Amino acid sequence: MELQVGIADYKLGSSPVKIVTYGLGSCVGVSFYEPRLKLGALLHIMLPDSTQFSGKLKPEKFADTGIPLVVRELEKQGARKSSLEVKMVGGAQMFSGPGAQTVMNIGERNIEMCRKVIARMGLKLVAEDVGGNKGRTMILDTATGNVTVKIIGNIVKVI
């Protein structure tokens, strides 16, 4: 069975489910895996920081609110935060041209904020495939904790 995660969303699943998110450009996918329970989650983050916005926000959209939300949901299912294996994929520079690096560096900002939140929460970032300028698909196998990354141009790697 396969669960699909949309932009600014997350899904939880347990073995033998595969959780997939498509279209990771400047967005970052963060997977969480609890090996003892064979329980996992995949979060598709769109923006780094919710504090720049007002009103009712979807916490899954942002690194600073989405990562803590998913960890809480996993803990409700019996996961131990200290056992979670975290992997991160995406954060590409999808825009080019004059000023693109300084103005539109959403991918790099997403990567930086994810790393900060993961470290602040005391989580273990065990692997990542980030940056560059190509879109990615991310698939978490809840039977093993392996993450398959498909990069545009027929490149496939397992992290």
Curated annotation (Swiss-Prot):
* Its EC number(s): 3.5.1.44
The record's Pfam families line, in alphabetical order, gives:
CheD
Q: Which Gene3D superfamilies match?
A: 3.30.1330.200
Catalytically driven reaction(s): L-glutaminyl-[protein] + H2O = L-glutamyl-[protein] + NH4(+)
| Family assignment from sequence similarity | Belongs to the CheD family.
Q: Which domain of life is it from?
A: Bacteria
GO terms, molecular function: protein-glutamine glutaminase activity
Q: Which UniProt keywords apply?
A: Chemotaxis, Hydrolase
Q: What does this protein do?
A: Probably deamidates glutamine residues to glutamate on methyl-accepting chemotaxis receptors (MCPs), playing an important role in chemotaxis.
Does the keyword RNA-binding belong to this entry? no
Broad EC category: hydrolase
One GO BP annotation of this record? chemotaxis
Has keyword Hydrolase? Answer: yes
Descriptive protein name = Probable chemoreceptor glutamine deamidase CheD
